[in-house]
Amino acid sequence: MTMRASVPMFYRIKAYGPEPTNMVHIPAGWSDMGNGMDPGEGFVGELPVHSVYAGGFYMDKYEVSSNLWGEVRTYALARGYGFDNTGQAKGPEHPVRTVNWYDCVKWANARSQKEGWEPCYTNADGSIHVTGTFAGGCDWSANGYRLPTEAEWEKAARGGVSGRRFPWADDTIRHALANYYASSATYSYDTSPTSSHHPDYDDQPEPFTSPVGAFAPNGYGLCDMAGNVEEWCWDWYDVDYYASSPQTNPRGPASGPNRVARGCSWSETAKGCRVACRFQELPTFANGSVGFRLVRSAP
């Protein structure tokens, strides 16, 4: 039995405003991380299963759409922000993709400023990060937007249900539930009648994304936590991190070559859609399978 560390309680005066639009409140509490199913079905880095405590936060109900990306990016460019990529999408309500980790950090700051919140990402000198390669830190007490930690993402994806393979209360997956590459002959828990990309969205050319919110939400009310596009997280990736992860608000290793991405995409199989699955990419990486969504710390 894993002993849970005590969680310090404190009172912080911080203006957070009303319940954010199109965001879902994820309550503070304990949840499990890692592959609790058959250890042989997972990838390296998904063990050991361990309990972590995450403070409360709000998460975007949907992956960031091209429409929202463009609106904030236009605001940002007029105020001195610089991005590595313009971002691409199949349509205005499809998830933006072909954005790297650095783009997402700057975009998060711009969205915070646009809406009147405190930016989370600062440079080493304390200035707000708006351009160039990020080498600063995250102000975790700020009330603005930021990328979720890996622990926050998995807690949210589980939807309040423990011990399940996917972001819903069922251990099987099919095209009625998510936009992914079906392969029922390979995975017994893939029950789609076809072995292919999602037939509703495989219109050429790639990528075969679906509009955000096209599938039913999970128990917390979040859409597309499996499939459509992978989602950038804050953490550096370490294959052995789970063996030494803090129990309270883990935020990943101090450094590393790659950042974590979660959630799988339209091009990946059922194995990648499991909530325990961890991906890693260079922070400069950008392609048609990776997008993001943001969070804000809750009071």
Model-derived features: positions:
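Short, structured beta-strand segments at or near domain termini in extracellular proteins/domains
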Residues: 13-15, 287-299
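Short, P/G- and charge-enriched loop/turn segments at secondary-structure junctions
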Residues: 1, 38-48, 198, 278-283
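Functional-site microenvironments in short loops/helix caps that host divalent-cation chemistry
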Residues: 26, 32, 36-37, 99-276, ...
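Cytochrome P450 catalytic domain signature, combining two hallmark sequence patches
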Residues: 74-88, 117, 162-166
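A short glycine-rich, aromatic-capped structural motif
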Residues: 18-80, 98-112, 151, 227, ...
